[in-house]
Amino acid sequence: MKFILSVLALASFQHVFCDDVERAYAWRNISFVDTREGTYNPEDVIPTGVTHDAKTKKLYFGVPRLYPNIPYTLAEIDTNKYNSSEIRSPPFSKFNSQGGKEFTSIYQPVIDDCRRLWVLDVGEADYKKNGNEYPTKNPEIIAFDLNQEGNPEVHRYKLEGDVAKTPLGFGGFAVDVLNPNGNCATSDETYLYITNFIDNALIVYDMKNRNAWKINDDSFKPEPGKSVFNHKGEEYTYSVGIFGITLGDRDKDGHRLAYYLAGSSTKVYNVNTANLKKKVKSLKPTLLGERGYKTEAIALAYDPKTKVIFFAESDSRQVSCWNIQKDLKPENVGVIYTNAYFVFGTDIMVDADSTLWFMSNAHPPTKIPKLEFDKRQIRLMKVPTHRAIRNLPCEMRKA
């Protein structure tokens, strides 16, 4: 009887809480279009970031050069060509852009309100390399216009000095367009907020004035102790600072609340972007509360339609939600998805159609570079946000 109950419990754990969550794609090993077999090791292809363009139905992936011979570090998939019910593991194609320079290593792509695709090329491969395969250079912020044919490059800025000191510590970033309802084609009233989990810092980039600066705060630091990642009975520890950041709604002056968390913490903070833009010496963030035991996450995403923030958690094999109109405490946090094979949530985003996309890659920031798995370990899921939160604490029900 105990054995039967254990099997039933495991089966329950392997299923989603929300019936509307769909598996978009899953990979054990990722291949590349127009790239000859044997020139790279498919096991070394580990995407860390993803974004979806709702207009073209294309997915864009950051594939950092964690190992040698990665064909390209910014990839795409046209979901119109690959029906997820028929093709579970489509190959990656090289990002299509006119006149763009080659990248060194990209972790995350982000699409802003003007349909510009932003990437941060950290300028350095994350392994000990021989020779000059990928020359080390300064990190660069780059934007491409998805509204134009060929996705031309429309902006590039090289980070220098103190803000570029530890490029392999860059985590997630958010793009803040001040007036997306205006003329986006000429809009340069844009800021980027880039986390650095090694320096426990936030890098602010002012596109109009082409200037970047660093902000430090105690709230950016990891909690005391180590985060633990469990796999096949073994425990792996890590400790990282501020990693995920997302932006709330605009006020009448165009400012927003930036919500952020450290990768080794269950606390969530926010700060008004007006303070970030002013280069203030004292940040004075607000501690919103804690999400609960073992709920560490490195990625979060805000949905303006439902007023909900979603979290891709690190060790719990789940995705959770919290409505910003409620106090942040464990009883107000809901779980929209849990699956034993959703191993280490690496990125999460809400597209222009209010569809939530979240990805796991089984690659935590531990000293063990690659873990062995029996099942496909890279999984990309999707669900409409309003369906994801039904009957959960993060849903605001009408009286």
UniProtKB/Swiss-Prot annotation:
In the UniProt record, the signal sequence range is 1-18
Question: Which SUPFAM superfamilies would you find in this protein's record?
Answer: 3-carboxy-cis,cis-mucoante lactonizing enzyme
Output the InterPro entries linked to this UniProt entry.
6-blade_b-propeller_TolB-like, Royal_jelly/protein_yellow
- Gene3D superfamilies attached here? TolB, C-terminal domain
Tissue distribution: Salivary gland (at protein level).
Q: Which UniProt keywords apply?
A: Glycoprotein, Secreted, Signal
- Where is the protein situated, by its record's location annotation? Secreted
Disulfide bridges in this chain? none
Stated role: Probably modulates blood feeding of sand flies on vertebrate species by binding and sequestering different mediators involved in the host response. Functions as a chemoattractant for host neutrophils; likely acts through a G-protein-coupled receptor and effect is dependent on calcium influx and phosphatidylinositol 3-kinases (PI3K) activity.
Question: What is this protein identified as?
Answer: Yellow-related salivary protein M10
Per the UniProt record, the source organism is: Phlebotomus duboscqi (Sandfly)
Q: What is the lineage of its organism?
A: Eukaryota, Metazoa, Ecdysozoa, Arthropoda, Hexapoda
